[in-house]
Amino acid sequence: MTERYIVAIETGSSKIRGAAAVADESGMLDVVAVEEEKLIDSVRYGCIQNIDVSKAIERVCERLESSSALQEGTITGVYVALGGRSLRSDMVTVATELPAEMEITPAIIEDLKAKARAASDASRDVAAVVPVRFTVDNKAQANPVGTFGQSVGARMAVLTCAPQIKRMLRRVIEERLGMKIQDYIVRPLAEAALVLTDDERRLGCMFVDFGAETTTVAIFKSDAPAYLVTLPMGSRNITIDLTSLNYIEERAEEIKRISGNAMPAEGPRRPGVDGIDYSEVNTYVNARASEIIQNIVAQLEYAGMKAADLPGGIVIVGGGARLRGFSDLLGKHSKMKVRNGAVTGSVRISDSHINAGDYIDVISILQAAARLPETECVEFPEETETPEHTADGDYESMYADADDDEGTSRIGRGYDDDDDDDDDRRRKRSRRDRQEKGAPQRRRTAAKDDEFIDDDITDDEEMHRSSGIFSKLKNKLTNIFDGDGDDNFK
């Protein structure tokens, strides 16, 4: 398979996002469509709270299917992002003794991962197992595969989440929509893989995903995650603080986005032309932003590290990171260099209307999915051969199948309507084929499922229609070969 279509879904606290991309064998990812649906209070701290999420995902998928890149395709599977407050990382040490000195194979490493998975908290779902450090015969080994030894040990980061996270995702996607969840992908790890440089990961850095309701902090050292935690606070906390100034939440969010500044206000308070005292607004913004930043910086101590241990600095992503002055304030408190994460060159954006920096979350899921075993997320209808035009005068072959339903419908109708009917028939045949094969298929609303097909024509009506057709044919032939028509052959 030279290329394949990948679809990713990210269920955030403020919106549902979906994206489609084409991945090729070279590792290049071409993002062809991104859609989102605003949704408030249906997802809280990473966990789905309301079945409305299912409808939002369906609308997002329908818009993706309507894009030029996926025209006539049907989304049958998706990769889903995992994140939220319940996501945590635990370090587990495992080892295995080999019967004799032998080559370390990938199967042995997978066995170590299975042991780490089994050693995790049984009350939680395992989201990912990431190797941090290996030893072969008690000696550190960066990549043990291909080396020889009699014992292999590993320190693994086991990322887990609350069971209801996956359970609710299955309920709204697989049970309600009939689409298959191809795999779950831990969003913070995927985002870090997308925006961090090799030097930052090897030297050591802090990755921060500042979202609407949660903030995830991950520390990388020696090219592996050494620490990960999700804090139950985000940019929405700032918005809620501003509602105490007698603004509804939507207006408070708008004021924060347009005029908010995390850096402390300088000079006397001056009301704006719209009567809003922005100095007072930014006093609230600075107070809450400072609290969030203090909690971010405190994770260094909890991880047993200092700022000097992370020469790669801090890389920040997420909607909250766009707050004016937040990166500067974070650098001031942490005494570390701070930069905003950006999409790397391995990802190409086909649609010029897509600002890659605004969609790092869902694009990172696409990139992570492209590195997994090949699975198709989009099914296209089988191409049908177009019959060749019949030679002039070959009346018998032209009308041999005139009594066929599909052939009959072409006579006396415009070509545009005819083509639309052919497309509808192909889509229906494609859906029937998927049902017969047992392939997953997204459920449609009744208004879109109940496409009209005139199956109630009686035998008498059909005979009358056929009789009319052949009557027209007879008149046509008569006009050709009557006295007037003979003039053409003189």
Q: Model-predicted segments: where are they?
A:
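Nucleotide/phosphate-binding catalytic cleft detector across ATP-hydrolyzing
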Residues: 1-15, 19-77, 82-204, 378-490
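Residue-level signature of catalytic and energy-coupling elements of molecular machines
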Residues: 9, 18, 80, 173-174, ...
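Conserved, well-folded catalytic cores of nucleic-acid-processing
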Residues: 63-67, 119, 176, 245, ...
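Phosphate-binding glycine-rich/basic clefts of nucleotide- and phosphate-handling proteins
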Residues: 70, 84, 158, 163-167, ...
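Short glycine-rich phosphate-binding loop at a beta-alpha junction
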Residues: 72-83, 303-319
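Phosphate-binding/catalytic loop of phosphoryl-transfer enzymes
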Residues: 147-148, 198-221, 227
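Nucleotide-binding motor/catalytic cores of P-loop/tubulin-like NTPases across gene-expression machines
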Residues: 227, 316, 320-363
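Glycine-rich phosphate-binding/hydrolytic loop that grips phosphoryl groups
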Residues: 342-396
